[in-house]
Structures are given as C-alpha cells and as structure tokens.
Amino acid sequence: PPLEEATKEGAKGPANVPPDASGIDLSTLETKNLSLLYFDPVQTYLTPYIARAFENALIFHQKTFNWTPWDRTTLLLKDFGDYGNAAARSSPNNAVLLDVAPLSVSMETFTPGERFFTLTNHELAHVATMDVWNKRDARWRRFLRGKPMPIQEHPESILWNYLATPRNAVPRWYLEGSAVFFETWMAGGLGRAQGAYDEMVFRAKVRDGDKFYSPLGLESEGTAVDFQVGVNDYLYGTRFFSWLGLTYGPKKVVEWLGRDEASKPFYAAQFRQVFNRKLDDAWNAWIGFERDFQKAQLAKLSAYPLTEVTHLSPIGLGSISRGFVDAKTNSLVAAFRYPGTIGFVGTMDLASGKLRKLQEIKGMMLYKVTSLAFEPATRKAYYTEDNYAFRDLMEIDVDTGRKRMLLRDARIGDLVVNPADKTIWGIRHQNGFATIVRIPLPYAGFNQVHTFDYGLTPFDLDISPDGTQIAASMGEIDGKQSVRVWTTESLLSGNGPQEIARLDLPPSTPESFTFTPDGKGLVGTAYYTGVSNVFTFDIATRKYEVVSNASTGFFRPMPQPDGSLLVYEYTGAGLTPSRIVPQKRDDLGTVEFLGARLIKTHPELKEWGVGSPAKIDLDPLITERGKYRPTKRMKLAAAYPIIEGYQGSYSPGYYFHFEDPMQFSQFDATISVSPFNNLPKRERLHVGLKYKTLN
C-alpha cells in the first residue's frame, strides 16, 4: 500500500498550527474549576483525559494546602514544538500551558510515566503554591481588583504583586523543587524525586569535588555558567525538599509552602518560622548530608571492581549528541554544548581531544543537543535545528563544514541512515503522536511509515548494517520502557511493525541501543541497578549481559574494531568522551536513592498517591463546550495606584488593566494628574490608552 507523503515544506492544513498563534481558533471544555482550551479536531481526543487529570490533581492540592483557588484555572493545549513542556502561573490569573508533544526522557532526565498525568500534577503544584492565600492576601486582592503582574511601565506593580501574591516572589528552585516533590509522591513514587539521573548528578559532584551552589549562587552562577543551566533549579530544589521531608517530615514541608493565617508572607521568613532556623543554615546542612550520603553510595559501588575509564577529552563537554566514529580522520562526529559556547556540530580528535567546530546549531537542546546521523561514504552528517520548535532537517559536509537545509519544519528527529539504501529514517512528532518516517533520496520529502497509538513513544532509532532490522526504545502509557527490534520489511509493508525481539530492564529506561557491527546484537545503557551501565543484547537468544560497572554513569556506547567501547562518562562537568573495555559482570553494587530513604522513614507519603484520573466522573462536571472568544472574556484584571512624571513634576494616578484569561486581548488605561506645578489646566490631566491583540 502507498505510504503517506509530505513535501519539503511539511504537512499543511489544520494539523500544522503556526507557532505564532495568530488567528487562533480554540475550542473549550468548561467545568467549575477548569477552562480547557484546545484545537479541534486534532486535540479533541485528549480533552477528556486531561480534564480528568486536572480535576484529580486539584482535589489533592486543595486538600493538602487547605486552599480554595482564587479563580478558575485556564489550561491551554498547544502543539508549537516537537518536544513536550509545560508552564504555569498564578498572576494575573491561574493558568497552565501544556504541550501535547512527547517529552524527552534522555538519560532519564524526566519521569517515564504518562506525560499529562505527571505534568498536570506538577503544574497544579505551581498554581497552588503561588496562589495560596489568607485573609490578608484576600484583602489586597480585592483592593487591587485582582493579582497584578509586575510590568516595566509601572515599577510599583512589583509591590502590588507581592502584596496580592507573596508566594509568587520566590526563587525558581523553590517552585520547581516543590513541584517535583509533589509530582513524585502523587504518582506513588514515580518521579524525579526518586530519579536515577538526579542521584548521578550529585554522586558525580562528590566524586569529582565539584562545587555545590548556595541558594543565591544557584540563581546567578548556577543557572548561567553550569552546563545544566536552569535545570539546576529542578535538581537542587528537589534534593533540598527531599532532605527537608526526610529530616522534618512531609507535614512541615507542606506547612512551609502553605499560607494559613499565622504564616509569614515572605518564603524565607516562613521557613524560619516553620523550621526554627535560617534557610541558608538548612541549605548548608543539606549539602553536608548530601556529601556524606553520596560518599556512602560511591563506597557501595566500589565494593565491586569499577570499570577503568580512559578519558579522551581533557575536560567535560557538558551535553553531547549521539556520536559516530569517523575512521578516516580518527575523530568523533557529534554535536557539543558546553558552557561558554553555542551548541555546534563538530568533530573531536580521538587522539588529542581537540575539538573542531563545523556549524553552530540554531535551536539546540540541552541533553541531546540535536538529533544527528552520519554517512561516512558521502562524508555527510544530518542533524536537526529548531529543536524546541518545528524541527528542520539539515545536511552538513564534515570535511568542509558547508551546510544546507533539506526539510523545513519537518518535525523529524531520532535520525539514522539506512546503510543499505542510504534513506534517512526518523521519528516525527505531531498532535501528540509519534510516527516513524522514511526520507528517500534526494531527501526532498518524507513518507510516514507507521504512526503509533497515543501513549506509545519510540525514541533512539537505529538500523542494522544490512538494513533488514530496526530497533528503538519504546515508552508505554503505563511507564513501562523497553527496546524493541522489528523487521524493516514489516514496517514498509504497511501492516504494522513485526517484533522479533524485546529487551525489558524494569524499572529503568533502556536507551541509546544500537546494532553491533555484525548486526546480531545491540549495545546500549540502562539504570537497571540505579547506575547507568552498558548492556549487550543478543537478538537471537534474547539474552542480555551487563559489561561495565560505573561509579557515575556511562551513556551512548559505540563498539570499536578492537573490542573496546567509546562511551560518554558522566562527570561533574557533564559528559566526557571516554574509552572502556567491556567485561561481563555477574555482580554489581547498587545505590540507595534519597527518595527511597524518605519513603521508608515517612511511609505516610504513600497516602499522597492520587490514583488514576479514570475515577473522575467528568460528564456531570462539564458546564459548557464552545469556542474561545477572547474579547468576550475580557474583564478587569488589576487596578492600582501609580506615580508618573510630567515636566519634572509628580503625577499620581491609577492604572487599569483588562484582559482575557489567555492574554490574547488586552486593554490598559492609565489616568494621572499633575496638580503640583503651574501647568495650564489642559496639561494637568494625563490619559494613556493601549489595546493589544495577537495580530
């Protein structure tokens, strides 16, 4: 049967929504607590589940914080990027933005559970911890006619914002750490507070003598010069909240985040009131605990012989894409992203570690940098740009550095070249679905080979040397992860993938599995013991072996002709290209997760599990379905005193702001007077009007 085809410009029509969102046509699903906005018909299938997940999470947060939301939450579904993300706010109104695209779980940096369940629990934790209020806050919100946002034109708005929503004025580690803490225990322990990646980060810091940031240093240096940039807020915040929960108990954590009548508005003052110590003192105590905790884990791992590692680079290189060894130049072809440089496609000499930049990457990712494939015969590499938007497919000559765009906005990643016929295969994300695609020569368009059901998300695609088999890691809706091997013929036939082998290593996510040079097996990594080690998998026998014992973690192994493996070892400075000799291991050390110690010490956290959203009877909760008309939903969102200046004189006045919940239509009115100098009467009254729309 013919395969669905798309042109160089990508698919057209309602399924491909332009990222500028001009002329938006949104449908709505309304309940008492939720206004869910979405694009019909391509996102309609998601709305019942997401609405249930929202109501499910809301019940938990209302009970936990004794919180009544100040206003209804507006939730917007969007598909403006190829990887999922989310955002939340409580000022000027409660709102959540959710991308429908699959999330990147590279190196288990995100929870492999059902994404909307996890994201909704996480984002509503943000809304709750920022919107919590007591009688004092309520008085200010009524006086200010809402929860004013800080705006540049009127610096006084910073004060009004703090008085109305004091818990909006908090550092990001506070927001993300608390949200990950709740996300994990609301899911019964499946989350980053029990994540192997987080453990590895701090284990590597201790092993390598890397610095720990203070709360102030984290928000300045830690999110600017460290390769993980803003993700450090998640990492540090989550560890600190977990330590607080372990040391003082979950109830104290909730008390700190809450806003009862006796609480302090400023988060640090509230911390001292709840824990009877300064925040900085507690932070330092956590760092001392973390060092001792990780030293104990390193000792457990070294009880068994550790794999000897030869670093091929003199420094850690932050994030590195999938790499390929170019035998002609004895170099590693990959994409690199580390502090002080824009991510680039380049090469690293395997003898000296010297880097050669070929081209900078527009729209690089954090951990993956880009999706990269290499064809040594033609000296061409293929990679993606605009990785957080609609991805473009690029071609680059690894000898000259010349590049050209092959497909614009194709939304394709996880690239691999089929050695048999030089077609490029990849995985395309659109409308929440993942599709395996094939790009034939001359790479002017692509064929959609197979679209997986919602909840099935393949990644880390690879093709056997003879082109007859395809392998990919696969995430399922229930959080299970595996590596699957299919015949290429079954995919091309249109009858669906025919599975010939599967590797499960629960509860870890097997990733970066690639075919061995003889095509009979796969080699990749997994946190099977809590540490990311290298595994080999025999396709015929379906048996696996672990061939390394890492103290931090190994990633993206590449078999070499001499039997060694090129791997990326995780260090305090990120990934470092290295060489190891694989050796079968029958015994490995395991590590204790901080989250595991927390739940063992405080089993009451088991009661935080919110269960499946399926238990929410949604139909009786729906109050309306229709279209979102921004102008009809505009209302007064804030009104507060201001001070302006006119010809050297003070001009007291008032600012009024009207908007719809998504801020698609906004109207501002500023009225002030200048009564304190000898101005003509016609110049004493000042009125400024401004209307803004998306267009």
What do the predicted segments below correspond to?
Residues H61, P166-A196, F202-R277:
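Active-site-proximal alpha-helical
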Residues K328-N330, A377-R379, A420-K422, D466-T468, ...:
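Short coil/turn segments that connect the beta-strands within blades of beta-propeller domains
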Residues P2-T165, P171, G188, T223-D226:
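Juxtacatalytic substrate-recognition/specificity segment
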Residues T307-P314, K354-K362, R402-L407, G445-T451, ...:
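A short beta-strand motif characteristic of beta-propeller blades
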Residues R192, L317, A335-G346, K362-Y367, ...:
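A flexible loop/linker signature enriched in serine peptidases of the S9 family
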Residues D349-G353, D397-G401, P440-A444, T488-L492, ...:
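Short loop/turn segments that connect beta-strands within beta-propeller blades
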Residues A299, F336, A526, T576, ...:
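Outer-membrane beta-barrel initiation region
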Residues P2-P19, D25-E30, F227-N232, E255-F374, ...:
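Beta/coil-rich, acidic/histidine-enriched accessory regions frequently appended to metallopeptidases
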